[in-house]
Amino acid sequence: MVARTPQKQRKVAMVVPPLNSDLLKETINKVDKCMERLQELQYTIAGGTKVVSGVNLSPRSTRIYLKTSLRCKQETLRIKNATNKKSPVGKFPASSPGDWRKMSLPAMLLGETVNEILQASQVTRDIVDAIAPKKSRKSRRLTMSQEDDGPKTPETQQKSREQNPETVSSNIKARRKKEKQNRRSESDSPPSLQRARSRIAFRTISPQVKGNNGENSFRHLANRVSPKHKPWVKKAVLFPNPLFISGTATQQAKFSRTMSPVIARNEISSIKNNKETPYKFLIKSPPTSASKFQVKIRSPPKVLVSPTRNGSNSVRKSPRGSRSPTRTVNLGKKSASISPIRNTGKRSPKLSTAAKLRRSFTPTRNGSNLARKSSISPKRVTLQAFLSPTRNGNFCKKSPKASISPTRVCNKSQKLSTAAKFRRSFSPSRLAMRFVSPMKSRKV
C-alpha cells in the first residue's frame, strides 16, 4: 500500500506559490554583504580612508564619476523646473529639500541605493516568513540565531549517547593498570633486548664490499675529496702576508716597494743589525765625465771650513800659490789639484744648503772672499803650491806627492752646488776681485 497525504494538506500545497525559501535566504545574505560594501564606499566618499578590496577609493578615480556628475546636473535642472517640489517617499525628507545639493553627487547616489536595498531586503524577509512552514518556537530561535551569526553546522545527536564521566575515568584506570603489567613483564627479560628495540638498526655491510672499496677508494673519492681531508695540500690565500713567506730578500723588497702596509721581515732585521741608511737616502757618486752644471753630491761631507778661518788661512798664504778648480798639473805620473775652498784639515759641523746661501751674503763672508780670492787665480797653478805643504795648510800632513783631485781633498771635501756658484759670481766683492786677480796671476 502506498501512503497518501490527506486532502487538507494537498489543498494548502496547491494554494502556496512555488517559491524556494532557501534561495530567498541566500539572496538576503548577498544583499546584506552588498550593503556593507556600499557603506564602506559611502564612508570613503564622505572623506574617510576606508579601503574596499585593497584599493583606495576616491570620488574622481573612476570614469563613472563624470557620468554621474552629468546626471546630477540634469537632475537638478529637472527638479527646479518641476511643479511638485516634494521629494518621493523613502528619499530625503520634505523639510530639507535642498540639503542633498550641498553633498557630493556620489554620496547622494549611494544614500539612495542603500535605502532601496534596505527596503528590498525587508520585503524579502517578510515573504520568507510567510512562505516558510510553521515550526516550533525552538527551531525558529535556532534559525534566527543562524541568520544573525551566519550559517552553522547542525549539532550532532551523538552527545546524548555520551558516557558518564565515572565510566570514562574507570576506563582510563583500567588502561593504566594494563600498561603497568606489560612493563613489569618486560623488565623480567634482559635489559639489552629492551634497549635494542628502541635503537636504530643500521644496515650491515658485507666484508666483500668493504674489501673492494678499500682497494679502489682513491679512484672512487677522486672527485669528492674536500680540502679538509687533504692536510698535505697548502691552502690558497688570496692576499698573502710577506711576513710569513720564507722567500728571498729581493722578493720581499719588491713587496715593500708597493704601497701595501706590510713591512718585510728581513728588512727590519737588516736595519736593526747594520744600522745603515736605506736605499732611498743613499747618495750616489757623480760620473767621471760630469759637466759643470750636473753636480751631484757623492757622500755626506764630514769636513767643512768656516769662512773666518778660511779667510785667515788664505791671507797667510803666498799669492803665488794659485789654485784652479778646473786644471790639474802632472807631477811625475800623478796629478795634483786642490779644490778652491775646502783646503784645511779642520772640521766643522754639517751645513745645509739654505745656511750656505745665507752665509754667502754676510759682510764677514765678503771680507774673507776678498782676502782669499786675492791669492787665487782661476787660470794657473804653480808648482810651489803643491811642493810646499806648509803654505797649503798641511793638507792631512802628507807628502807633496800625494795626488789631490778636485773632487776629493782627503775624502772630506764637498762640491759646491751650481746654484751657489752662480749666486757667488754676481756678488760685488767677487766682481771687484775678477778685475784684480788676472793681473796677479800674470805676475807669477
Swiss-Prot record:
Subcellular location: Nucleus, Nucleolus; Nucleus; Cytoplasm, Cytoskeleton, Phragmoplast
Main localisation: nucleus
UniProt cross-references to InterPro entries, sorted A to Z: TAN1
Membrane-spanning intervals of the chain: none
Biological process (GO), any one: regulation of phragmoplast microtubule organization
GO molecular function, one term: microtubule binding
Source species, domain of life: Eukaryota
Keyword presence, Cytoplasm: yes
UniProt keyword annotations, A-Z: Cytoplasm, Cytoskeleton, Nucleus
A GO cellular-component term linked to this record: phragmoplast
Segments of skewed composition (Polar residues): 205-216, 307-329
Chain spans, region Disordered: 131-218, 290-354, 390-409
Subunit-level organization: Interacts with POK1.
Database matches in PANTHER family: MICROTUBULE-BINDING PROTEIN TANGLED-RELATED
Purpose: Is required for spatial control cell division during plant development. Through an association with microtubules, acts both for the positioning of cytoskeletal arrays that establish planes of cell division during prophase and for spatial guidance of expanding phragmoplasts toward preestablished cortical division sites (CDS) during cytokinesis.
The name this protein goes by in its record: Probable microtubule-binding protein TANGLED
